[in-house]
């Protein structure tokens, strides 16, 4: 999936911003979170997050649910490189495995399991 954030910001600018963030906040992970294009789930109010490195994927999903005001009975799926990451995985390990060459971790979310699991 193509990232709107990548389309709107040139690579050099994104890379410089991610480096600045990592220097200033060494224990945090720069994350870009965007909705899967064709999903009918609500659009999130902000794309950029500074996530504590010891946060789990499940805790991050909880943050996203709150930001889009998703009711408890509705499902949400998050994807990294079009794969569902394990809920118990630490964001720091996901970042190390999947960070983009610009230094950001790109996460997409959807109301349906559009890609499948590992």
Swiss-Prot record:
PTM (free text): The C-terminal Ser-117 and Ile-118 residues of ATG8 are removed by ATG4 to expose Gly-116 at the C-terminus. This Gly-116 forms then a thioester bond with ATG7 (E1-like activating enzyme) before being transferred to ATG3 (the specific E2 conjugating enzyme), in order to be finally amidated with phosphatidylethanolamine. This lipid modification anchors ATG8 to membranes and can be reversed by ATG4, releasing soluble ATG8.
InterPro entries linked: Atg8-like, Ubiquitin-like_domsf
Principal subcellular localization: membrane
Residues with a covalently attached lipid (Phosphatidylethanolamine amidated glycine): 116
Residues cleaved off as propeptide: 117-118
Alphabetized Gene3D superfamilies for the sequence: Phosphatidylinositol 3-kinase Catalytic Subunit, Chain A, domain 1
Phenotype of the disrupted gene, per the record: Blocks autophagy. Leads to reduced conidial germination under starvation. Especially, leads to reduced CP15 levels in conidia. Also exhibits enhanced sensitivity to oxidative stress. Impairs growth of the mycelia on host cadavers and considerably weakens virulence.
UniProtKB keywords: Autophagy, Cytoplasmic vesicle, Lipoprotein, Membrane, Vacuole
Residues at the site labelled Cleavage: 116-117
Pfam families: ATG8
GO cellular component: autophagosome membrane; Cvt vesicle membrane
Bilayer topology annotation: Lipid-anchor
GO BP term, example: autophagy
Entry's localization field: Cytoplasmic vesicle, Cvt vesicle membrane; Cytoplasmic vesicle, Autophagosome membrane; Vacuole membrane
Highest taxon, organism lineage: Eukaryota
Role played: Ubiquitin-like modifier involved in cytoplasm to vacuole transport (Cvt) vesicles and autophagosome formation. With ATG4, mediates the delivery of the vesicles and autophagosomes to the vacuole via the microtubule cytoskeleton. Required for selective autophagic degradation of the nucleus (nucleophagy) as well as for mitophagy which contributes to regulate mitochondrial quantity and quality by eliminating the mitochondria to a basal level to fulfill cellular energy requirements and preventing excess ROS production.
Stated family: Belongs to the ATG8 family.
Listed name of the protein: Autophagy-related protein 8
């Amino acid at each position: 999936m193509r990232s709107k954030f990548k389309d709107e910001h040139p690579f050099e600018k994104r890379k410089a911003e991610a480096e600045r963030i990592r220097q200033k906040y060494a224990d945090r992970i720069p994350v870009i979170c965007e909705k899967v294009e064709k999903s009918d789930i609500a659009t999130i109010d902000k794309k950029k997050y500074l996530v504590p490195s010891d946060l789990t994927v499940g805790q991050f999903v909880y943050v996203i649910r709150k930001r889009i005001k998703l009711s408890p009975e509705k499902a949400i799926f998050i994807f990294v490189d079009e794969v569902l990451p394990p809920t118990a995985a630490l964001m720091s390990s996901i970042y190390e495995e999947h960070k983009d060459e610009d230094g950001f971790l790109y996460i997409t979310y959807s109301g349906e399991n559009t890609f499948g699991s590992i």
